[in-house]
Amino acid sequence: MENNRAGRPKSCRRVKEMPKVRCFKPQGIPGIKLEEMVLSVDEMESLRLADLEGLYQSEAARRMDVSRQTFGRIIDSAHRKVADAIIHGKSIVIEGGVVMKREEQVHNAKPGCVCQHCGHEESHRSGLPCRDMICPECGHHMIRKGGCGTGQEDI
């Protein structure tokens, strides 16, 4: 059950890397017949930190640059979504979330634009926002390097 309340916008969450695989589906069921469960990029990162790396929530929260309470809400949501998808035979699509790759906040000396889909980088052009640029490699929208992106593939 999703809460669509108005309130503060989500703060930027730090992730180690964008997902290399964006969809998982049950074997033997055509994709067209499957219901999708969308797991945000920050929810995937919370699973990586807590379940794969075995970090305590306080350390995982520090790495994602969120409060421990916020991390708890993110990981709880991720666990519910993954369990629902596995139990009910849904595909898992990884996209969305307000995220920034961790190293970009430190190593972003030169302004530029980056494609979150394929990683292609271009110099920033004055007067043209990165979000309005299309990646010449894959055709997806680009974001400002070091800025918060949506983790969303533009279709």
Curated annotation (Swiss-Prot):
Disulfide cross-links: none
Family listed: Belongs to the UPF0251 family.
UniProt-listed Pfam families: DUF134 (PF02001)
Protein name: UPF0251 protein Paes_1249
Coiled coil residues, start to end: none
Superkingdom of origin organism: Bacteria
InterPro entries: UPF0251 (IPR002852)
Source taxonomy: Bacteria, Pseudomonadati, Chlorobiota, Chlorobiia, Chlorobiales
Transmembrane segments: none
Species the sequence originates in: Prosthecochloris aestuarii (strain DSM 271 / SK 413)
